[in-house]
Amino acid sequence: MRMVCISRSNDIAIGLRLAGVQSFFIKDEKEIKDKIRELSKDANVGIINVTEDVYEIAKTELNSISKTQDLPLIVKIPNSK
C-alpha cells in the first residue's frame, strides 16, 4: 500500500516527495475533488494525506470515503505557514 498527498502548497508537495510520498500539487477545486475520487478507488492507496485547505474544499467527499470505506485512511495535515 502506498501513501499519497494532495496539497495546494508546492512546498508541502515537494517536501513529501523528498520523503518518498507521491504528492499532487493541485490548485483547482474541481481537480482536487476528482483526484480524491480517483485515489479513493485505487486499491494500492492506503493513506491519503490532505492539507487543511484541501480538506475544507473536499470535506463532503472525504467524510463520505471515511464512512463507507475501510481504506484509504484520510489524514489531515497542517498547511505550511
What are these regions (language model features)?
Residues 50, 54-81:
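C-terminal structural segments of small proteins and small subunits
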Residues 25-31, 78:
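Short beta->alpha connector loops at strand-helix junctions that form conserved
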Residues 15, 34-35, 57-58:
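Phosphate- and divalent-cation-binding pockets in alpha/beta enzyme and binding domains
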Residues 31-39:
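A short, acidic, amphipathic alpha-helical segment used as a generic capping/interface helix at domain edges
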Residues 1-27:
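N-terminal first-folded block
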Residues 21-22, 40-41, 63-67:
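Short, solvent-exposed amphipathic alpha-helical segments in soluble enzyme
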Residues 11-12, 31, 54-55:
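Alpha-helix capping/helix-boundary segments
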